[in-house]
Amino acid sequence: MAQEVVEGFKFEQRHGKERVRVARVWRTPQGRHFVVEWRVGITLFSDCVNSYLRDDNSDIVATDTMKNTVYAKAKECSDILSVEDFAILLAKHFVSFYKKVTGAIVNIVEKPWERVIVDGQPHQHGFTLGSEKHTTEAIVQKSGSLQLTSGIEGLSVLKTTQSGFENFIRNKYTALPDTRERILATEVTALWRYSYESLYNLPQKPLYFTDKYLEVKKVLADTFFGPPNRGVYSPSVQNTLYLMAKATLNRFPDIAYVHLKMPNLHFLPVNISSKDGPIVKFEDDVYLPTDEPHGSIEASLSRVWSKL
């Protein structure tokens, strides 16, 4: 955000529109439908200081205009496109269409509508709502510079063994025992930033970023679970998080930065006794699932050459 000196004070400003909801349907000649549902947020950086200092709104892009632009641009998209490409399209429009706008940030969350399978066949126009959400943020400057981030919200994963936690700091406040056998469950929030720094060197392949989103999600899940027949041991959420981020950077050379947040969602062993003896004796079988309170673990990993 640009900083100015106004009447002896440092002043920063921006304005935008949040929670603009839009759905778009595309129909192929063969009768197959495709649908997306997006929640769009827009932030503009512009020279409209006079609107704050005096009765002069002549330099403001109205937030209602921003909202209408979302629908107009969605209408113009005659071909299916990724949420990243739509975010870039919107941000590019604002910095090129308005002389006073120097930069734009567009955030979008995509609702996970997935094609339904009926009698073993993909339905032509039927969809069910999935779980994790696809997110993106495009930051575009009038110069054409770009910062593009994608992400996942709500990727819930769990494994019933091959997890432990041992040899941590102990003191008079510590009650947690060491273990090499526990359930590991988390809800992954992931962000990754692409290395593309200009509007003019983006991949031209249709739906490139949609495919990349699915591939990153697979790498994260595969690293968490390990091979299907034996899994992989996790000595801590921290170690598993690092391996997931590292696998992402190793697999995708055009990703420069990864941030993962992985709360430790606890499954507590159930032991219940009465004065007459055990009612439930825990044998790695009965648990109390709880997410309040929960551990909070997050970290970022980037390439050494990255500017991030």
UniProtKB/Swiss-Prot annotation:
A GO molecular-function descriptor: urate oxidase activity
Upregulating conditions: In root nodules after infection by Rhizobium. Nodule uricase II levels increase from 11 to around 25 days after inoculation, then fall slightly.
Pfam families, sorted: Uricase (PF01014)
EC number in record: 1.7.3.3
Subcellular location per the Swiss-Prot or TrEMBL entry: Peroxisome
SUPFAM superfamilies tied to this protein: Tetrahydrobiopterin biosynthesis enzymes-like
InterPro entries: Uricase, Uricase_CS
Pathway, per record: Purine metabolism; urate degradation; (S)-allantoin from urate: step 1/3
Enzyme kind, highest EC tier: oxidoreductase
Positions of urate binding: T63, D64, F165, R182, V237, Q238, N264
A Gene Ontology cellular-component term: peroxisome
Catalyzed reactions: urate + O2 + H2O = 5-hydroxyisourate + H2O2
Tissues in which the protein is found: Expressed predominantly in the uninfected cells of the central tissue of the root nodule. Also expressed in the nodule parenchyma cells and vascular tissue, in the roots, stems and leaves of uninfected adult plants, and in the cotyledons, roots and hypocotyls of developing seedlings. Localized to the metaxylem parenchyma cells and phloem fibers of developing roots.
Keyword set, alphabetical order: Nodulation, Oxidoreductase, Peroxisome, Purine metabolism
Superkingdom, natural source: Eukaryota
Active site: K17, T63, H266
CDD domains to which the protein is assigned, alphabetical: Uricase
Record has rRNA processing as a keyword: no
Family: Belongs to the uricase family.
Protein's job: Catalyzes the oxidation of uric acid to 5-hydroxyisourate, which is further processed to form (S)-allantoin.
Quaternary structure and partners: Homotetramer.
Protein name per Swiss-Prot or TrEMBL: Uricase-2
Organism of provenance: Phaseolus vulgaris
